[in-house]
Swiss-Prot record:
UniProt zinc finger (GATA-type) residues: 169-193, 226-250
A GO molecular-function descriptor: protein heterodimerization activity
UniProt-listed CDD domains: ZnF_GATA
Annotated Pfam families: GATA
Effect of residue 169 to Y: In pnrD1; abolishes DNA-binding
Compositional bias per record (Basic residues), positions renumbered to this chain: 446-456
Record keywords, A-Z: Activator, DNA-binding, Metal-binding, Nucleus, Repeat, Transcription, Transcription regulation, Zinc, Zinc-finger
Function: Transcriptional regulator involved in several developmental processes during embryonic and imaginal disks development. Involved in determining dorsal cell fate. Acts as an essential transcriptional regulator of proneural achaete-scute complex (AS-C) and is required for its spatial regulation during development of the adult peripheral nervous system, and hence for the positioning of neural precursors. It is the only factor to directly activate AS-C genes.
Single Gene Ontology BP annotation: lymph gland development
Gene Ontology terms: cellular component: nucleus
Positions of transmembrane segments: none
Organism: Drosophila melanogaster
Compositional bias of kind Gly residues: 284-294
Stated name of the protein: GATA-binding factor A
Length: 540
């Protein structure tokens, strides 16, 4: 921006021409009007000039403040050699040192006369481009005169503490503080002493008392001494059985040993022990020793829940497999007992049935803690089977197979044959409740078996053995592909045939009892399984 140049006759004229400019038009021309404000410079004329704002095409002179008189007489900006760019069309803009207007409110008249608003630029540019040190330092001294600065600043009292004479706290003698305060008499206090005096009504103590001194003075009482050792300093005063005061050491010694503490053990100083940081694992170790049974149960339930939440299929496989082994063993023993005592009375069989149902319910309730939804489904199936067993007049020999299906939670069937009838007994499986294999192979319980029931005695044994096949294959229905033996498992039809179960175990008794009946029906069941598998493949 161009600046109006003065002739340099009087200092007041140079300062008065820098007050406030009046801008007109589209910011292309700036009319600078200034009047003489001093009586000593009344002869000076008012200068009005029009110059270009950013780049002056006529004159490229950017002289500032008290330029030399020869510059004014010789022409604008001609006699000032090396001051600024001398080219007419200078591509580089050289800013002036005009400051913001609001500086005058804080830094007095000297700064206000040397301050000018730069329209079109949001920052104030200092004149650091000039090699003329005299002109630059002269303007700097006039702009930041210490007398005018301290005289006109509204923060004079605050600045006086920082740059003026030093202050000292009358209480602690501090010479530097974030905030100086005054007491009631007008003396200066540091921030800490002032706040302490304001809160407590007394001067802040200068010396912190020793911790040992505080404990000694706090526990020392006038005319109080230990009746055993005679000491007057202790961490805790106690009383003996007679009510006399004793020190902490003598009191504890008498409490532990039942005799007075010997005088030879007296020490002048108070013996203190070094405290070790408390370990968090010590309490848990003691608790584990006392309540190991409860802790192990809780840990088992917690692990069961975590596995069920993270990997429900994996946890289902682990727990259901072990559950099937125990249920199959109990079911096998009960079936052998019932078959051995087939000639027993009806009432005894019903009592045994009720007892076994109670045992199954207890096992299911324990297993339901980990799998509540699965336990509910199994409980509903047990109730349905209980209704079937109450309505049927015979077929008590099917109890073991029924309980095996209830424990596995896979299949329900209706024994509709009576002891003297020749009606057909259809074994139906609920496909909605029968899970599929984890690899996508359909469950073996989708294959329905129909055999004609009559008065033949081997149907009881065959039914028990046949449903034991299903209980063994039910392991695969849980998502675990269990291959008992390569000779007994049909991979094409997904079923077991034969009389042995290999690794599943617990079926030796049933195998020995079933024997020939299972082998007789193996061919028929195999053919029927092929037909059912073909139907399932076609529908799926």
């Amino acid at each position: 921006m161009g600046i109006l140049l003065s002739d340099g006759d009087s200092t007041s004229d140079q300062q008065s021409t820098r007050d406030y400019p009046h801008f007109s038009g589209d910011y292309q021309n700036v009319t600078l009007s200034a009047a003489s404000a001093s009586t000593s410079a009344s002869a000076s004329a008012t200068h009005v000039a029009a110059v270009k704002m950013y780049h002056s095409s006529a004159v490229a002179a950017y002289t500032d403040l008290a330029a030399a008189g020869s510059a004014a007489s010789a022409g604008v900006g001609v006699g000032v050699s090396g001051y600024h760019q001398q080219a007419v069309n200078a591509p580089v803009y050289v800013p002036s040192n005009r400051q913001y207007n609001h500086v005058a409110a804080h830094f007095g008249s000297a700064a206000a006369q040397n301050a000018w608003t730069t329209e079109g630029f949001g920052s104030a540019h200092a004149q650091f481009y000039s090699p003329n040190a005299a002109v630059m330092m002269g303007s700097w001294r006039s702009a930041y005169d210490p007398s005018g600065f301290q005289r006109s600043s509204p923060y004079e009292s605050a600045m006086d503490f920082q740059f003026g004479e030093g202050r000292e706290c009358v209480n602690c003698g501090a010479i530097s503080t974030p905030l100086w305060r005054r007491d009631g008499t007008g003396h200066y206090l540091c921030n800490a002493c002032g706040l302490y005096h304001k809160m407590n009504g007394m001067n802040r103590p200068l010396i912190k008392p020793s911790k040992r001194l505080v404990s000694a003075t706090a526990t020392r009482r006038m005319g109080l001494c230990c009746t055993n050792c005679g000491t007057r300093t202790t961490t805790l005063w106690r009383r003996n059985n007679d009510g006399e005061p004793v020190c902490n050491a003598c009191g504890l010694y008498y409490k532990l040993h039942g005799v007075n503490r010997p005088l030879a053990m007296r020490k002048d100083g108070i013996q203190t022990r070094k405290r070790k940081p408390k370990k968090t694992g010590s309490g848990s170790a003691v608790g584990a020793g006392t309540g190991s049974g409860t802790g192990s149960t809780l840990e088992a339930i917690k692990e069961c829940k975590e596995e069920h939440d993270l990997k429900p299929s994996l946890s289902l496989e682990r727990h259901s497999l072990s559950k099937l082994h125990t249920d199959m063993k109990s079911g096998t023993s009960s079936s052998s007992t019932l078959m051995g005592h087939h000639s027993a009375q009806q009432q005894q069989q019903q009592q045994q049935q009720q007892q076994q149902q109670q045992q199954q319910q207890q096992q299911q309730s324990a297993h339901q803690q980990c799998f509540p939804l699965y336990g509910q489904t199994t409980t509903q199936q047990q109730h349905q089977q209980h209704g079937h067993s109450m309505t049927s007049s015979s077929g008590q020999a099917h109890l073991s197979a029924r309980h095996l299906h209830g424990a596995a939670g896979t299949q329900l069937y209706t024994p509709g044959s009576s002891s003297g009838g020749g009606s057909a007994s259809a074994y139906t499986s609920h496909s909605a409740e029968t899970p599929a294999l984890s690899n996508g192979t359909p469950s073996p319980h989708y294959q329905h078996h129909h055999h004609l029931g009559g008065t033949h005695g081997h149907h009881v044994t065959a039914a028990a053995a046949h449903h034991h096949f299903h209980a063994a294959a039910a392991v695969a229905a849980y998502g675990v592909k269990t291959e008992a033996s390569a000779t007994n498992y049909d991979y094409v039809n997904n079923c077991y045939f034969g009389g042995t179960f290999g690794a599943l175990g617990g079926a030796a008794t049933t195998t020995a009892m079933a024997g020939g009946a299972a082998s007789e029906l193996a061919g028929y069941h195999h053919q029927h399984n092929v037909i059912q598998a073909a139907k399932l493949m076609a529908t799926s």
